């Protein structure tokens, strides 16, 4: 969190200790109508679902031009199948959520009415299938904090300049 990062930086500064801070946040992928959809989908799926989204560099959500959103979502579904198989939870190479507390928090972020891929979980194994949520807004629970898990919200835009401005106005 930014609050903890400020505290760590203040203590490090007292002793001139060099530090690098990764403060988490809501890091979006922006896909406009000029993007190579297949390449974008492959990279987004790899980055998001590597280690079940539990990496500090994982994309947090996708902001996609409305005109290519359906194609992107369809291609991301294909990439999930290609990278993890038809049943990711049965794939020995697909990971688990770090602990039960984090698993429960993630499950609470999933709105079943917005799930277009995945959404399946196994509480005994602490696994959540790669999940894509569509028709997401900034008011949804999944957009209120860093996800740090295998849940990918998709939002659309009509103006690239407007979306960049909107992202820059929000806390990251």
Task: Set out the residue ranges of the language-model regions.
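ALDH superfamily catalytic-core signature
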Residues: 2-137, 159-161, 165-168
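Conserved donor-binding loops in enzymes that form glycosidic bonds
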Residues: 96, 152-153
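Conserved glycine-rich beta-strand-loop-beta hairpin in the small C-terminal domain of fold type I
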Residues: 124-129, 145-151, 170-172
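Cytochrome P450 core scaffold surrounding the K-helix E-X-X-R motif
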Residues: 139-144
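Short acidic-hydrophobic, aromatic-tinged amphipathic segments that line or gate anion-handling sites
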Residues: 154-158
């Amino acid at each position: 969190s930014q609050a903890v990062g400020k505290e760590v930086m203040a203590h490090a500064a007292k002793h001139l200790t060099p530090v690098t801070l990764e403060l988490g946040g809501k890091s979006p992928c922006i896909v406009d109508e000029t993007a190579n959809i297949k390449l974008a989908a492959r990279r987004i799926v790899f980055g998001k679902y590597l280690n079940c989204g539990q990496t500090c560099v994982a994309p947090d959500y996708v902001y996609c031009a409305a005109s290519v959103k359906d194609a992107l979502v369809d291609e991301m579904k294909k990439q999930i199948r290609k990278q993890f198989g038809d049943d990711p939870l049965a794939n020995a190479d697909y990971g688990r959520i770090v602990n039960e507390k984090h698993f429960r928090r993630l499950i609470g972020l999933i709105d079943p009415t917005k799930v277009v891929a995945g959404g399946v979980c196994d509480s005994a194994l602490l696994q959540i299938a790669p999940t894509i949520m569509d028709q997401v807004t900034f008011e949804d629970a999944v957009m209120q904090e860093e996800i740090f898990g295998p849940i990918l919200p998709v939002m659309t835009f009509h103006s690239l300049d407007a979306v960049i401005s909107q992202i820059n106005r929000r806390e990251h």
